[in-house]
Design a protein with these regions (language model features):
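Conserved structured core elements
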Residues: 34, 116-119, 123, 225-228
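Well-ordered mid-protein domain cores that form the structural environment of catalytic cofactors
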Residues: 57-153
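Metal-dependent nuclease catalytic regions and adjoining charged, substrate-binding loops involved
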Residues: 113-116, 128-209, 215
């Protein structure tokens, strides 16, 4: 998914992971995601099912998944690990249909609705699933029902609601090989020259922003706040410090005020 946000990002994830800095909001989102994932195991498993462990290494996780699927497992498989053409996925919930002759894939998100990036994520999972030699009957996204009310006694039934994305995913599948090829080229070749912009925070805040955005100055452009697209254009025009930006390139009352105050060196 990283490559769909920014090819430079996926290159850095492989070659310069040391440059990553996760914001407190991102760390909190990770924690919530893990909690929702644990709840999905509880809700879909109902005390049953097998979670594929990753602490014994990738090879073992892949082997365990294949063994479980080959056995026609009737119980849910959690974190099923599959690989195809160098692309690795871990399926949150994998449910057997017709004693393992077909499968139902469920991706779980700590969101309250289906977002465009979720469809792309599911498309990649479906492509790997099929490429690894397995068919699927359907692929769905389970997200939090924002109308859910907890009534006590540890009963969270109804917390997650499923949306069938099979049709939307099928439309994206022909494009997945192109995405994969682009990602491989970005990883194996020199770092892509991608300018900063709105994609730095959408759909997720990039942990490499501190590296890509100019910050070796007293008043970096990011200090203007607001639209990353507008700030990215200023950086593309060669500006690193707020004080160096000509007034003609500043728009919007908020940016104009910050620009004036910063250049004047005193508050208004």
């Amino acid at each position: 998914m990283s490559s769909l946000q920014c090819l430079k990002k996926v290159h850095l994830e492989i070659h310069r992971k040391d440059l990553q800095v996760f914001s407190s909001d991102t760390e909190r989102a990770f924690a919530i995601g893990h909690e929702v994932g644990d709840m999905a195991i509880r809700l879909y498993g109902q005390g049953r099912g097998v979670e594929v462990q990753y602490d014994s290494g990738l090879a073992r996780a892949l082997m365990t998944t294949e063994e479980l699927m080959a056995s026609g497992a009737q119980e849910p498989i959690f974190e099923a690990t599959l690989e195809h053409e160098g692309v690795l996925v871990r399926e949150d919930v994998l449910l057997s249909v017709d004693s393992g002759s077909d499968w139902r894939i469920v991706e779980v998100k700590a969101s309250t609705k289906v977002k465009p990036e979720h469809v792309l994520d599911c498309a990649i999972q479906a492509w790997v699933h099929r490429g690894a030699g397995h068919d699927f009957e359907s692929i769905s996204l389970a997200h939090i029902d924002n109308q859910f009310r907890y009534r006590g006694d540890g009963n969270y039934d109804g917390l997650l609601v499923e949306n069938d994305l099979t049709e939307a995913v099928q439309k994206e599948l022909p494009t997945v090989p192109h995405w994969v090829e682009e990602a491989k080229e970005a990883v194996e070749g020199p770092m892509p020259d991608i300018p900063v912009g709105a994609h730095c925070t959408k759909p997720y805040k990039c942990p490499f922003m501190g590296y890509c955005w100019p910050n070796d100055t007293d008043y970096p452009i990011s200090g203007l706040g607001g639209s990353r697209k507008k700030l990215g254009l200023l950086v593309m025009n060669g500006h690193e410090d707020i004080r160096d930006v000509p007034p003609s390139e500043i728009s919007g009352a908020g940016h104009e005020r910050i620009h004036r105050v910063t250049r004047a060196g005193e508050s208004e």
